[in-house]
From Swiss-Prot:
GO terms for biological process: translation. Keywords: Ribonucleoprotein, Ribosomal protein. This is Small ribosomal subunit protein uS2. GO terms for molecular function: structural constituent of ribosome. Belongs to the universal ribosomal protein uS2 family. PANTHER family: 30S RIBOSOMAL PROTEIN S2 PROKARYOTIC AND ORGANELLAR, SMALL RIBOSOMAL SUBUNIT PROTEIN US2M. GO terms for cellular component: cytosolic small ribosomal subunit. Residues 287-302 have a biased composition (Basic residues). The gene is rpsB. The keyword Ribosomal protein applies. InterPro entries: Ribosomal_uS2, Ribosomal_uS2_bac/mit/plastid, Ribosomal_uS2_CS, Ribosomal_uS2_flav_dom_sf.
Length: 302
């Protein structure tokens, strides 16, 4: 992470809310109260930001995705730019209740929106009645506002980043119910315990929001680079294994078995057969029969 505490100071990250609006649970991150304003400890902000960046980098590097949420006026453009540069889903308009806790219904609505877009592109919408086309286009405008940033989201996000915990309290609560880790900027009027990775800082000033979001974007981009490198290495390893397997099969097929001649047993008459001294197939030897002697007649005694 290239952001230093001095950079955070120059961006005004240390300015909290008025002391009368502070949340007692933010006390561990408050350095002092001056002129009725809570001053945030930038040392703790820097440590928390570094920890959050490491978490998001590992999450994205392992194949996860991050949902960027910032619907307040100061954060809209920054969040949209950050999500677009990292190809991540985002929400910069009104948070639609149930986006995380009732995702299956939202997913069907997104599929319907994509169907309308396809009909408009292919010209099939022109085949419908003008009254029906007008109704569909009005619905598409509403869907565009609600789903434009999450149309290509494959499923529930692996993690979520929010700019203002209080302003995005519904989104934060849904993430907690869905078991999704949440990283966010937490001002002195917010409860940091609602986030898994709170970043204490000014969530109202544009400069403060931008410097923190830029650090988050850099971490996500590093995670994407790690993911691509791992996929490339895995692909190369698979190709190498496939080539080795193919070579092994070919070698086994073409190999000639070796014979140890010292262990071959020869028949006893092999020498006679080789030298031609054995029996001939052309003139087989026939065993001679012994002559049979004629029996003499018996002489009777007188």
């Amino acid at each position: 992470m290239n952001v230093t505490p001095k950079d955070l100071l120059d961006a005004g990250v240390h300015f909290g809310h008025q002391t009368k609006r502070w949340n007692p649970r933010s006390k561990p991150f408050v350095f002092d109260h001056r002129q009725g304003i809570s001053i945030i400890d930038l040392g703790k902000t820097h440590a928390a930001l570094e920890k959050a960046c490491t978490f998001l980098e590992d999450t994205v590097g392992n194949g996860g995705n991050v949902l960027f949420v910032g619907t307040k006026r100061q954060a809209k453009d920054i969040i949209r730019e950050a999500a677009t540069s990292t190809n991540m889903p985002f929400c910069v308009d009104r948070w639609l209740g149930g986006t995380l806790t009732n995702y299956e219904t939202v997913k069907r609505s997104i599929a319907k929106y994509k169907k309308y877009q396809q009909m408009e592109t292919s010209g099939d919408m022109n085949k419908l009645a003008s009254k029906e086309v007008a109704a569909i286009k009005r619905e598409m405008v509403r869907m565009q506002k609600n789903f434009s940033g999450i149309v290509d989201m494959p499923g529930l996000p692996t993690a979520m980043f929010v700019v203002d915990v209080n302003h995005e309290k519904i989104a934060v609560a849904e993430a907690a119910r869905s078991g999704i880790p949440c990283v966010g900027i937490c001002d002195t009027n917010s409860d940091p315990s609602t986030l898994s990775h709170p970043i204490p800082g000014n969530d109202d000033a544009v400069k403060s929001i931008r410097i923190i979001v830029e650090a988050i974007v850099a971490a996500v981009q590093n995670g994407l680079s790690q993911r691509d490198a791992r996929r490339a290495a895995r692909g190369a390893a698979d190709l190498k294994a496939a080539a080795a397997a193919a070579a092994g099969i070919t070698g086994e097929t073409a190999a000639t078995p070796e014979v140890d001649l010292s262990k071959v047993e020869l028949p006893a008459d092999v020498a006679a057969v080789v030298e031609g001294e054995g029996e001939s197939e052309a003139e087989p030897v026939v065993a001679k029969k012994k002559p049979v002697r004629a029996k003499r007649p018996a002489v009777k005694a007188e």
